[in-house]
Amino acid sequence: MASSLALKRFLSSGLLSSSFLRPVASSASRSFNTNAMRQYDQHSDDRNVDVYRHSFPRTRRDDLLLSDVFDPFSPPRSLSQVLNMVDLLTDNPVLSAASRRGWDARETEDALFLRLDMPGLGKEDVKISVEQNTLTIKGEEGAKESEEKEKSGRRFSSRIDLPEKLYKIDVIKAEMKNGVLKVTVPKMKEEERNNVINVKVD
């Protein structure tokens, strides 16, 4: 009885503010902004996307969303990471709509195909190289200009580690058209991978 009276006095005194009655936000969802959502942010007032853990458990693939594959400051990524990110964004409509990525990657039995949106850049602004199975793609507006001129244009950069003995890195093809770069990396055939040299013994 005494405890009941004490509770009534506590409630009537106003000490229990409305903030204590607010429901606690579930830890199963988070709102966040990432670099991969920059283009989405520019076209929407709602800058947050709720991601529910129970829908797709957090794995290493989810960490890839924290920076765009073709962000100038992103670290080198393996090909499997890039393809996994594509699968993750494609399979989940929420993430796919939120990212609006300016790139795509797909792999077939014959080749690897990469597409990068580089608005404002021409083929003279793009450099593609392969060193120790690492494919490097760089694009910089006004890359051919002289050193004296200030360069403050767009920049694109990415490094992708390709698996060894799987792709023909010496016959990579690239095409730049209307601000879109398409890169094709042919695959080796099975007999080409098994590069066995028999040495005759005299």
From Swiss-Prot:
List where this protein forms a coiled coil: none
Listed A to Z, the keywords are: Mitochondrion, Stress response, Transit peptide
Annotated GO CC locations: mitochondrion
Q: List the disulfide bonds in this chain.
A: none
Keyword Mitochondrion recorded: yes
Q: Which PANTHER family match?
A: 23.5 KDA HEAT SHOCK PROTEIN, MITOCHONDRIAL, SMALL HEAT SHOCK PROTEIN HSPF
Q: Which family does it belong to?
A: Belongs to the small heat shock protein (HSP20) family.
Q: What's the protein here called?
A: Heat shock 22 kDa protein, mitochondrial
Instruction: Supply the gene name.
Output: HSP22
